[in-house]
Structures are given as C-alpha cells and as structure tokens.
A protein has these predicted regions:
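A compositional/structural signature for long, glycine/proline-rich flexible linkers
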Residues: 2-382
C-alpha cells in the first residue's frame, strides 16, 4: 500500500516535470511570461495614477527596471549551491523607496545549506545583514528573518570579518537561517557613496568552496524564473503605485496612514521610514522642518509617483546627515521646489510636479519623529 502511494507520487511528479519541460520547449512558458508583463502594465494604467506623459513614461520604464533586476536575481544568479553577491538596485534599477546612499548586495540562498560571508568592512556609516524567507521583497514569503548589525559583530582592527549563516548556532558572527530562508540582503549606508570605500565581500556555501561548477540551465529552472519575474514585476509595480495613490490623499503632509503591510515586513528593524506626497504648483515650495533624532544616520530623498528615487546623479534630490546644513539649534529645514530658491537644503524636483518625499532615521533604539510641512510661495523664500 505504501509502495503504491509512493509510486503514484513519483509518477505525478514526473508528469508535472514533463509538462513544465514541454511548456518551455513549445514556447508556452515564454508566452505566459509575456502575458504577465502585459498584465503588469495595467498597474501603470490603474485608476488614481497620473496620466501625464512624464509619469506614464517613467511608470513603464519602471517595469523594465524591475524586470531587469529580477532576471538577474531569479534567473542569472539563482543558484543557492553556488551563491554570488550581486547588486541589482542602483542608479538605473530601482525598487520602492530605495536609499540613494545605500550600496545593496544580495544572494540566493537555501536554508538547508550553511554559508560563509567574509571580507573587509569598508567605510560605510552603517551596515546590516538581513535574511529573507520566500521569494523576497515583492515575491511573497514571511519577510525579514534574522538580522545582524555592526554593534553585535566582531570586526578585526584591520576591518576584516566573517559571518556564518546556518540553522545551528555558530560562535562569532552568526545569522540563524530557517528551512525556508531563500535570500540575503546586505545594506551598506554611506555618507558619501562615491567618495568612501565600499566593503569587499565574498560568499561561499560551506562544504563546497567552489569544488563543483554550477549546473547548466534546466527547463524547470527557466520556467520557475520566468514565473517569479513576471509576478514580481507586477506585484512590486503595484506596491509603489498603490502606496503613492493612498499617500496622495494627504498631500504635502507626512503621515503613516498609507503604510503597506507588505513592504513593512521586509524592512530592517533599525530603519524608521516616513513619506509625504508632494503636489506643488510651478511657483510653490514645500518646506519640511524637523529636529532629526539621535541616530547613526539620517537622510531625506525625493521620489517620483512610482516611488523611485529621482535622478540623484544629476540633481540634488537627496541629502543626509553629512551633506545637509543644520540650524544652530540642531533642526533642519528642507525646501522642495521646482527651481533653486537660493536657500540651503534645496531638493530639486527634477521636473516632477508631484511625487513623494521620504525621510529615514537609522540605528538602534531611535526615537521616531515625523517632520512638519507647509506649502509656501517660492517668492517668500527669496
């Protein structure tokens, strides 16, 4: 009886595998992938989203960026037996509300394996390691699992260190993985990302150390990757758009009313993040005032309607605790405007009449605060 049940199970698995292979061979998998991408485009056209040409163009560009980044993560580098640390969030591949001061690294993992990360720390102001379950941000799963921050790590005087990832406890720097652990995210946060040295990090699966080469691509792996990437692109695009639409109900005001549980569960626990939706006329400015709390690092940045940071390479659309000018009493005043008002801490909207402005307070035990805002005529600031 048991043998028959096992044979039936094996037979069913074989049929499913053969069906998956056939879907790749006859092009069904590719056509379904293209259909998912077409469906993702409906997120851009959904009610509540702006219809002007700039927003629409950036919305559809966002889909291509999400697709590019997720193909790197879920297809090109999705071998947990041979993990690689890759950066798939940067100046031209963005995700909901990413931090311009961060250098993001990630790798595909499998909770049944143990891993070692090693290297040198570099000059980042703040660094964190987060394990994710499921497909990671936007792809489902419980969200952030174990986390590790520098104050709980041993780092040698020369900046070198190692971190072990395993289900069983390990002495030293250790991240507890679970059976459903599927990826890691490493954030390096810089005061001056271009001018400071980045960490030199490496990862290996313990017990392999490069002894066996990666497996060739299989139809099953391609089918799975295309399915995940298609859904990921649609889901993450929807997260950004829906969040902004909700936030726009409270224009030019910081509020947590629009917070999304799906994004909240993928946060690092030491990061406090708040948003406002700016909507300004040509001759208006949004004044943002706050006394930044005591923390390791803080920043402010502008985003478009789709929650992508604006072009911070060619525009001053972000400032941090190192680059901003503070008042004598320790407070900070930022001015969001379409053109330079000739005052300190101008944040350039880079041609965007509306979008979001976000602040981050980062570190352990941060006393959270919300900035105050007011809309003024640009002439009042001259």
């Amino acid at each position: 009886m048991d043998e028959t049940a096992q044979d039936d199970g094996a037979s069913t698995d074989d049929v499913v595998q053969q069906d998956v292979v056939q879907q790749v061979v006859d092009g069904t998998a590719w056509r379904e992938f293209c259909a998912l991408l077409a469906d993702a485009g409906e997120s851009i056209l959904a009610a509540g989203n702006p219809e002007d040409p700039l927003d629409r163009a950036e919305g559809f560009r966002m889909l291509t960026r999400l697709m590019r980044g997720s193909l790197e993560s879920f297809l090109e580098h999705a071998q947990p037996r041979h993990p690689q640390l890759i950066c798939t969030c940067h100046e031209t591949i963005k995700i909901v509300g990413e931090n311009p001061d961060n250098h993001y690294l990630g790798a595909s993992l499998d909770g049944k394996y143990d891993y070692r990360i090693w290297g040198t720390r570099g000059e980042a102001k703040w660094i964190s390691f987060n394990l994710f379950s499921g497909a990671g941000f936007g792809g489902g799963g419980p969200g952030t699992g174990a986390t590790l921050h520098e104050e709980h790590m041993h780092i040698e005087p020369d900046g070198s260190f190692e971190v072990i990832i395993s289900q069983t406890e390990h002495p030293g720097n250790w991240l507890r993985s679970e059976a459903d652990t599927r990826s890691i995210a490493i954030r390096q946060t810089f005061l001056d990302k271009r001018g400071q040295e980045h960490a030199d990090l490496h990862i290996e699966r313990i017990g392999d150390q490069g002894a066996t080469p990666p497996d060739p691509l299989t139809p099953e792996a391609l089918h799975q990757a295309l399915t995940i990437v298609g859904h990921y692109t649609k889901i993450v695009a929807g997260i950004g758009a829906q969040w902004a639409v909700r936030q726009a109900q409270w224009p030019n005001v910081f509020t947590d009313e629009a917070e999304d549980d799906l994004t909240d569960k993928f946060k690092d626990p030491q990061i406090k993040w708040h948003q406002a939706y700016f909507d300004l006329g040509e001759d208006e400015a949004l004044v943002v005032e706050v006394v930044p709390p005591a923390c390791d690092y803080w920043m402010i940045a502008l985003h478009n309607h789709w929650m992508e940071t604006l072009d911070y390479v060619n525009h001053q659309s972000t400032l941090n605790c190192h680059s901003a000018t503070l008042e004598p009493d320790g407070s900070a005043r930022f001015v969001v405007a379409h053109r330079d008002p000739g005052v300190a801490n101008w944040l350039d909207t880079a041609g965007h009449r509306h979008g979001t402005v976000g602040v981050r307070w980062v570190g352990p035990d941060v006393v959270d605060v919300l900035p105050s805002t007011r809309v003024v005529a640009l002439s009042e600031l001259a």
